[in-house]
A protein has these predicted regions:
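Surface-exposed binding/hinge segments that line
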Residues: 149-200
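N-terminal lobe/hinge region of extracytoplasmic solute-binding protein
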Residues: 54-106, 137, 218-219
Length: 568
């Protein structure tokens, strides 16, 4: 039986990946493509070069699906390997990829995929249903070990079988509402390459590197890796035998930068064709460059996760939803959007992004109106009086809280923190900050009790289906993806029910109830929804089609590069 909960032994290994993986699909939720955006009416050059992308602060970790964990890794897999289906960037609907069509049984427990017959691996062997069945069964078999990082994509899967070369049948142990939305994210691997590595305990699955300097790389997507340098520049080249629409470009390069100034300079000098994500502070200057286009992509929620663990005892007042509500209405969200994100953000009010509406949830929760007077009134009513220093005292302790900031977003989040500090000082609450490389291990602690922190500024994304966004707040994710330690049995029960409800209307009602619980418990305080800002050379046309790429390397759609072209 598939499970999403990592074993105790693996949890701390997964913690380092958790926040990065949560960013996977933030851009997909708001629509990735857009067309236009710096395009010209000229004809594309007949000799298309490599499109060079610079990424600030983000890098790939591996091109082995059993080892990789960042969104950039999974974006590469979408371009390298077949997938059963994919999201359309135009309307976020699931559309065919390797599977031309699919059907499901009335009870939702059997899925049958009809695969196309013209797909081939780069070594000339055909892509068949056997490859898909092998991939799925291998992940299910080793989900508590070597394939744990892929296990979320096979939730509820019992077995996959190849009925014939182009017919795949997947049997589920129970109906899974988000099955199609998750299974397509699993890259289909060539059985003849990976089967020897899956022998025994599967430990050898982690040994393949997909480094062309060390081994033959076998893929079937529109691009293959030509040069692998995880800390520098990785280059992908076009696969001319790809079964789908052919990209115009010969390939694309992906270079990691730790310093935004170096990346921006490389763009200005012509060493790069595009750079993301740009610090909002530099966007005004770049907009003045005649050769560059600057645009925001996606809709990422920025929130405050307040410690909600019943094991946390230092500041028990934080467990009170009334205190959290007071904190929430003391915050000036519009100020954060305007001064920190320079127009590339808008105030947020719901723990789920409004793009889920109306298919999966009712109208999103309104943005909390700032009301400092009411916040002070609530805290006074709870008996938390201000001391001589202006800081309130609760349960014998000053209301001084440590807020964790993820180093990867240090520049923006430090400025967000400064505004939060100013806002909450108006209601007698003092904040301090601590920058950490990855806050989750520090938050959860070795025993996953969440004893040693007060709050954290969190940012993550979700897939168009809200299952994963809801999943992170379950009790089973304490010590893994759950940022606040929230543990509500009623919520967990609703999550399990919606996960197996294949009637859309009934599932929507369950999700509405879950959102009501999360909002009522003030599990997280939404601040803003922000965009990743990208700049690119205007000589390139249809760069906006790469919206998902700029939201961490597109993982939703293999056709993103199709119209990208350099103008004559």
């Amino acid at each position: 039986m598939s499970t999403r909960v990592p074993s105790t032994k693996r949890r701390h290994r997964l913690l380092g990946a958790a926040l990065v993986v949560l960013l996977l699909a933030a851009v997909a939720v708001s629509g990735c493509g857009g067309g236009g955006g710096g395009g010209q009416s000229a004809s594309p050059s007949a000799d298309q070069p490599v499109f060079r992308i610079g990424a600030i602060g983000f890098a790939m970790t591996s091109l082995n699906p059993f080892v990789a964990y960042t969104a950039m890794d999974y974006g590469a897999f979408m371009q390298m390997y077949p997938s059963l289906a994919q999201y359309s960037n135009a309307d976020l609907k699931v559309k065919p990829e390797l599977a031309e069509s699919w059907t499901t049984s009335a009870d939702g427990k059997t899925w049958t995929f009809k695969l196309r017959s013209d797909a081939v691996w780069t070594d000339g062997k055909p892509v068949t249903a056997n490859d898909a069945a092998f991939t799925i069964n291998t992940v299910v078999k080793f989900q508590k070990g070597p394939s744990a990082l892929l296990s979320t994509y096979v939730v509820g899967v019992k077995e996959a079988k190849a009925q014939d070369a182009t017919t795949l049948v997947v049997e589920l142990e129970r109906p899974v509402a988000a099955f199609l939305a998750t299974i397509f994210q699993l890259p289909i691997l060539p059985e003849h390459v990976w089967a020897p590595l899956a022998a025994g305990d599967g430990s050898k699955l982690a040994t393949l590197t997909n480094d062309p300097a060390k081994e033959t790389v076998v893929v079937a997507g529109p691009f293959t890796v030509q040069k692998l340098d995880l800390k520098g520049t990785t280059v992908f080249s076009r696969v001319d035998t790809f079964y789908g629409p052919k990209p115009l470009v010969k390939g694309f390069g992906y270079q990691t930068f730790a310093n935004p100034d170096a990346a921006v300079q490389a763009l200005k000098s012509g060493q790069l064709d595009a750079v993301y994500p740009l610090p909002p502070a530099v966007t005004d200057t770049l907009k003045q460059e005649a050769t560059l286009e600057v645009q925001g992509f996606g809709d990422m929620p920025l929130q405050i996760a307040v410690n909600d663990s019943p094991d946390y005892t230092k500041h028990p007042e934080l467990l009170d939803p009334k205190v959290r509500e007071a904190i929430s209405i003391a915050i000036d969200r519009q100020q954060i959007a305007d001064s920190v994100y320079r127009g590339y953000a808008k105030p947020g009010g719901s723990v789920l992004l409004p793009q889920f509406s109306p298919e999966f949830m009712s109208a999103p929760v309104a943005v909390p109106a700032r009301d400092v007077a009411k916040a002070n009134e609530v805290l006074e009513g709870l008996g938390y009086k201000k001391g001589s220093d202006g800081i309130r005292v609760a349960n014998g302790r000053p209301m001084k809280y440590m807020v964790l900031i993820w180093s990867i977003f240090r520049a923006e989040h430090a400025r967000v923190f400064d505004l939060l500090k100013q806002n909450l000082a108006e209601v007698g609450i003092s904040l301090e900050s601590k920058v950490v490389d990855n806050p989750l291990p520090l938050m959860a602690g070795k025993d996953a009790k969440y004893r040693d922190f007060e709050a954290e500024i969190v940012v993550y994304g979700v897939t168009p289906d809200p299952d994963f966004s809801l999943f992170i707040f379950t009790g089973g994710m304490r010590g893994a993806y759950n940022p606040s330690g929230y543990n509500n049995p009623e919520y967990d029960k609703l999550y399990a029910q919606q996960g197996g409800e294949i009637d859309p209307a009934k599932r929507k009602a369950l999700i509405d109830n879950m959102v009501t619980l999360l909002q009522g418990d003030q599990v997280e305080m939404p601040l803003v929804s922000w965009q990743m800002v990208t700049a690119w050379n205007k000589q390139w046309q249809n760069v906006a089609d790469l919206g998902c790429v700029f939201g961490f390397f597109g993982y939703t759609d293999k056709t993103e590069f199709n119209r990208l072209a350099l103008m004559k």
